[in-house]
């Protein structure tokens, strides 16, 4: 994926690159807050549906209880594979604050989203098995503020759908050369 065209800072172009980057993922890193105030990092299968973004996790997973207890205090991250990155220092990444709401298993929404999940990943036996497992739950993620980083000098804040160039309190005296 070539992100060099992002340099023009055109918001529509950047938005398209963010969508393209995000669409390449079937799982997402999750940071969640437990009842005891400790943060847990993990990952979960991601279902990018016409209905939004969903995760499907077991109630045995540590982050399940965290999401139930603190559904409005979640962070998710899409991170470029280290093997595909030009350098481990500048891995492309996309991070969002998120909230989660549990989807009832026997609802039309659950069935529609899971049908999309099966269609995308194929009707592998494992997918059919986890669909039937009663300890798994589906959560819809509502993404809010975030940041996309595509390299040095290519960091963008996302706030209510508005994308702006990220700046810091102590910017470099010498901008990154592209």
Predicted regions and their residues:
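Short, structured beta-strand-loop surface elements
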Residues: 4, 33, 62-120, 133, ...
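C-terminal edge-of-domain segments
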Residues: 2-11, 112-120, 124-178
């Amino acid at each position: 994926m070539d992100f060099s065209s992002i340099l023009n800072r055109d918001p529509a172009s950047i938005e398209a690159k963010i969508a393209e980057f995000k669409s390449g993922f079937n799982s997402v890193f999750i940071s969640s807050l437990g009842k005891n105030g400790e943060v847990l990092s993990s990952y979960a299968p991601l279902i990018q549906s016409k209905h939004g973004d969903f995760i499907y996790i077991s109630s045995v997973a540590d982050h399940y209880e965290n999401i139930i207890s603190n559904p409005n205090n979640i962070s998710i991250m899409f991170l470029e594979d280290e093997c595909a990155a030009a350098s481990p220092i500048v891995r492309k990444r996309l991070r969002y604050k998120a909230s989660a709401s549990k989807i009832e298993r026997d609802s039309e929404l659950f069935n529609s989203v899971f049908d999309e999940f099966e269609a995308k990943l194929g009707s592998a036996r494992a997918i059919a098995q986890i669909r039937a497992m009663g300890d798994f739950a589906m959560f819809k993620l509502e993404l809010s503020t975030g940041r996309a980083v595509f390299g040095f000098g290519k960091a963008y804040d996302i706030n209510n759908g508005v994308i702006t160039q990220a700046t810091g309190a102590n910017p470099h005296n010498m901008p990154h050369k592209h």
